[in-house]
């Protein structure tokens, strides 16, 4: 008798494009989005209002992949719930302030910085990380995320 063990993994990863992806939904809509790989934080409520965000990610991102970051904010005076507010992209397209060299392997983590200033004063915010790529064997990997809401 012979034995065989098989362990298969499939990462749901692709780069949806407006106009070519069927049923495309932009990541800036308040619900949904066409990318299947994303992480959304719980709403974060602040004691004092802020006007800027500074977010850092440690990520291993190969040349065939990308990480995009979106945010949404609301103030005490806003009658809308945070979940009803549309997402806004950091740097207009969700890209990092500056992109480090692509990672060579899954353990080659580099720091990505996303910052946005001159925002209307807000008392709550949420973040969305969208992972895209063309080769599902090499998805972006995120080790940790750090963020600060600033009143500048």
How should each PLM-predicted stretch be described?
Residues 1-152:
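Beta-strand-rich ligand- or partner-binding modules
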């Amino acid at each position: 008798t012979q034995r065989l063990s098989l362990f298969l993994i499939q990462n749901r990863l692709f780069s949806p494009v407006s106009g070519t992806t069927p049923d495309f939904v932009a990541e800036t809509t308040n619900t949904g989005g066409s990318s299947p790989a994303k992480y959304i934080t719980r709403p974060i409520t602040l004691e004092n209002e802020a006007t800027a965000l500074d977010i850092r990610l440690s990520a291993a991102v190969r040349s065939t992949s990308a990480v995009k970051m979106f945010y949404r904010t609301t103030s005490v005076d806003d009658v809308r719930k945070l979940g009803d507010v549309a997402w806004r992209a950091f740097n207009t397209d969700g890209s990092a302030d500056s992109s480090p060299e692509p990672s060579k392997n899954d353990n080659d983590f580099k720091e990505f910085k996303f910052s946005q200033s001159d925002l209307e004063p807000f008392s709550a915010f949420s973040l969305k990380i969208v992972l895209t790529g063309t080769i599902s064997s090499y998805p972006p990997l995120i080790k940790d995320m750090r963020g600060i809401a600033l009143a500048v």
